């Protein structure tokens, strides 16, 4: 996100944007990719509420949060683009608050990847995760990415 210091992320977090809502998709490739046509859109605050549930020493992926919302709401899947945006909004909103912190650093991208769009970037997320006992590994030579080693073993079960 750009110009984070000029944005009110807490206002964005509480703007439901006419969500929750459902949409039926008709594109056959998307239906095959996501396993159905019923797509759920969760509001930003719902991502924040789920992210707050992740305890010290545990992690979650955005994909697992999306699966949880779909299952909870009788959808085939949760829309992926807004999911990524809303997770970032929750992170920045927490960063802007002086209380009621959301432990956003525990929410990872696919395959346990760290999220460079969080406040402080990769380095800040890496520092916080390592402080909770996680090992961070680097992958790639030119397009370097960072991951929580064996993240599957410390995934939090939302159910």
What are these regions (language model features)?
Residues 2-159:
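Nucleic acid-binding interface residues in structured DNA/RNA-binding domains
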